[in-house]
């Protein structure tokens, strides 16, 4: 196999031997790749600082002659995203984004859109000096755009119950399992026990709709939401991906919620038992 040259984002890694390390990278043309880096763990390794998670790099690698792994030949650091490592909130948000990409991205599969999404997210998270709220909005936007790219965009124009076109309203009912909104007619019908449904404001709906279509290229494109509405749409995005991607337990809502622990609760409940179940699940 001839050497391959790709832009890449480091997704993480694991020690392989006393002197080597395996890193996982996201590439635009070949998706997730596992590269063995020989000599990476030596005290004076030339790779020090180059293999850190989040780094944007240029790599040259080729297939191992004796195994299934790729062997890293050269690596050039393009952007280290040092601002992310300097902020606990930014580091947390970036870690969540990377874990989600690792979960959905497959090896040897063209992933240009996912690569660009993660690159844009890291760029904005790295340069953001506006605090926790902006980072939370970036992460919410990232989640909905990710869902759209993997074919799980929610239905926000037609009712998931009857297919009727939705009219403008102050609030909507978002059905988690069904993956979309109910019209006023279907919303009037009683919910079945155990149904997971959330109240979504028109402002929050606009954020979800825009996020599914494109990721912002600047912080200024984000429209702030009141805290309660942000918590709700944040919680819905977590639960939506949990359910529809059947995420691994290590990516559960509990472990990927914001460090402050803020959680918006399901607002449509059918019994005391259902209420207890929903609250425990969050």
Give the residues covered by each predicted segment.
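Non-catalytic alpha-helical scaffolds and adjoining flexible linkers that form interface surfaces
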Residues: 1-282
């Amino acid at each position: 196999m001839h050497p391959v040259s790709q832009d890449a984002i480091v997704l993480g890694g694991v020690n392989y031997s006393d002197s080597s390390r395996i890193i996982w990278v996201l590439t635009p043309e070949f998706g997730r790749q596992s590269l063995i880096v020989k000599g990476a763990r030596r005290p004076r390794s030339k790779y020090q600082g180059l293999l850190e998670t989040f780094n944007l790099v240029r790599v040259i690698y080729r297939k191992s002659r004796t195994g299934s792994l790729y062997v890293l030949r050269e690596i050039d650091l393009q952007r280290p995203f040092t601002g992310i490592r300097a902020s606990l909130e930014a580091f947390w948000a970036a870690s969540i984004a990377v874990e989600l990409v690792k979960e959905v991205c497959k090896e040897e599969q063209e992933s240009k859109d996912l690569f660009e999404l993660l690159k844009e997210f890291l760029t904005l998270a790295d340069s953001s000096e506006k605090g926790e709220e902006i980072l939370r909005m970036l992460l919410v936007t990232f989640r909905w755009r990710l869902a759209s790219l993997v074919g799980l965009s929610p239905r926000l124009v037609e009712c998931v119950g009857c297919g009727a076109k939705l009219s403008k309203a102050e609030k909507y009912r978002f059905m988690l399992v069904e993956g979309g909104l109910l019209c006023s007619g279907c919303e009037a019908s009683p919910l079945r026990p155990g149904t997971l449904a959330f109240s979504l404001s028109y402002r929050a709906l606009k954020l979800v709709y825009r996020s599914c279509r494109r990721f912002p290229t600047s912080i200024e494109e984000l429209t702030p939401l009141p805290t309660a509405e942000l918590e709700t749409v944040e919680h819905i995005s977590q639960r939506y991906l949990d359910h529809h991607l059947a995420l691994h337990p290590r990516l559960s809502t509990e472990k990927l919620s914001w460090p402050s622990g803020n959680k918006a609760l399901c607002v449509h409940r059918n019994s005391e038992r259902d209420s207890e179940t929903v609250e425990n699940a969050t």
